[in-house]
């Protein structure tokens, strides 16, 4: 995984300025870490997934763009494909099957 929590935080705050959306990202990060702990999965990876799941939303709120734009950025930055898939699958309009525990938790 080509990220740390600090790098993910920088990415989030680069794209997201609204306090409400940042609080949402932090809450989802915490929830995902708790789910990862329960499932004995990688808490850092799951937390970063939660932190970044809507990072592109403020700049790309239309369903044709979110989370596609964010997924493209994450792929270019070297984030794992399972995380990118979970982020895409969390958006109902993408109509992607939620297969993994990460997909379902997010």
Can you annotate each of these PLM segments?
Residues 1-4, 101-103:
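General structural signal for secondary-structure boundaries
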Residues 2-6, 22-26, 40, 64, ...:
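Electropositive phosphate-/nucleotide-binding environments in soluble metabolic enzymes
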Residues 3-18:
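Generic N-terminal amphipathic, Lys/Arg-enriched alpha-helix
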Residues 9, 13, 26-29, 33, ...:
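Predominant activation on well-ordered alpha-helical scaffold segments within soluble catalytic domains
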Residues 17-44, 58:
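Alpha-helical phosphate/pyrophosphate-handling elements in metalloenzyme active cores
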Residues 39-106:
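Divalent metal-dependent catalytic cores for phosphoryl transfer on phosphate-bearing substrates
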């Amino acid at each position: 995984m080509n990220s740390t929590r600090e790098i993910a935080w920088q990415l989030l705050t680069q794209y997201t300025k609204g306090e409400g959306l940042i609080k949402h990202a932090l809450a989802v990060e915490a929830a995902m870490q708790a789910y990862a702990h329960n499932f004995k999965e990688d808490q850092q990876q799951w937390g970063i997934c939660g932190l970044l799941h809507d990072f592109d939303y403020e700049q790309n709120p239309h369903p044709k763009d979110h989370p596609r734009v964010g997924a493209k950025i994450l792929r270019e930055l070297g984030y794992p494909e399972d995380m990118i898939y979970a982020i895409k699958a969390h958006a109902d309009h993408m109509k992607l099957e939620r297969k993994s525990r990460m997909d379902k938790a997010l």
